[in-house]
Amino acid sequence: MLPFRSHTVEICISALWLSSCTSLSPLRPNTTANPTNSVIGQDGYKVAFVEFGEQGSYQDPTQLQNALALIRDTPQPLVITYVHGWQNDVESGDVQSFESLLARLNGAPAIRNVGFHVVGVYLGWRGKITDVPILKELSFWNRKNTAERLASNYDVYDTIASISEEARKDHPGKQYTVLLGHSFGGLIVERSVAHAINAEIHGHADASRSMPADLMVAVNPAADSVLARQMIAALYSRKTEDTRPLFVSITSTGDWATGIVFPIGTGLASVSKGFNEVEAPGPANTQVSERKFYTLTPGHNEMLINHITVDKHETINSPNGLHALEENLQHNHVGNGFTLDGAEGKLDVWQIKRVGDVDVPYWDVQVDPSIIKDHGDIWNERAEAMVAAIFRMANPILNRSAKPRATLHRAPDFNRLEHR
């Protein structure tokens, strides 16, 4: 009877899972009666939605058409494309949080002074499949597998590339694009960056159009650090020192999902896998089992972390009463400094400090939990202010003192790749 009972339990769990799952249909479909349902207008900016199914296919290709038309019709667009993560979709709280960020950017003096017009593109998928307790938490690995399919199949990358192409084609030299991903969305963003870096390194695309955005940011990415190690090593071998960031991976030390849950799951999975000894990027010639990169995310792997946030324990008066986000967009601060809103209208001074001996345009930033508390705490004002500072550091339109862009199309220095 035991096998029968076990089978019955499995059937019951499966039935409960299926009965509680979210819809497979697009949540913002365009129709004959409402052909622009996937675009919403707000005060001063608009947001377009593009949705993908379980295998990474377009759920409604007209959503992409509408997004591209929006970019094409917007003068001097600042395009922010966002890929959400676990426990979100195109109707979750992430939508309102994303719109709130767009509204703050749209109202910032620095953005208005250079003539940017803010456009948001929200890339949606079923990051959330159930609200049932326990099943909700257990969906982490199921959703990770889905995110990996989205990242490896064609349509998601096609959308990301089409967005940047449209902005650059219609507004050459006047546009700026940002690709932002959270959690499993960060995994998708990182895979997109890897394809682009490889294409530029080998001359398949020139620097003006190779990247999926002018700046790519992943916040608390739920991905192993195998790809991160490979990309950092490739950039290090091309001698990309003293250049502005192209890709910034941000992870809070308080992120339990990627810091605790992720290594437990990948540690169990690693038992059945084989791992070579690989070179950690840098001049130290350190070899380590690749298992270390398979089981840890980039922001929890001390062999890859090359920046940390540091509280300078200084305060400054807010120029013109600006909040930290607006101030960080408006002014440069010494040594990759940035400000956070402090007490009594003052601004606290922090720094994104480079650590270690690997200087590449892939920033792997470990963030203090007072800025980002945990895995989902990415939309608070302190986190947004820090990201705004990174945005200025990497944006030569806003910041004429920005460092030069890295030249990637060059032969590698194999001495930087080989164990000696």
Where are these regions (language model features)?
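Short, surface-exposed "cap/lid" segments of acyl-processing enzymes
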Residues: R72-W125
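Bacterial N-terminal signal peptides
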Residues: E10-S19
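Bacterial N-terminal signal peptides that target proteins for export
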Residues: M1-I11
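Gly/Ala-rich beta-loop-alpha elbow adjacent to hydrolase catalytic centers
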Residues: G181, G185, V189
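The conserved beta1-alpha1 loop
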Residues: T81-G85, H182-S183, N220
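Lipolytic serine-hydrolase domain surface
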Residues: T22-Y58, G115, L123-K174, V193-L408, ...
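N-terminal carbohydrate-binding/catalytic regions of secreted carbohydrate-active enzymes
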Residues: G56-R72
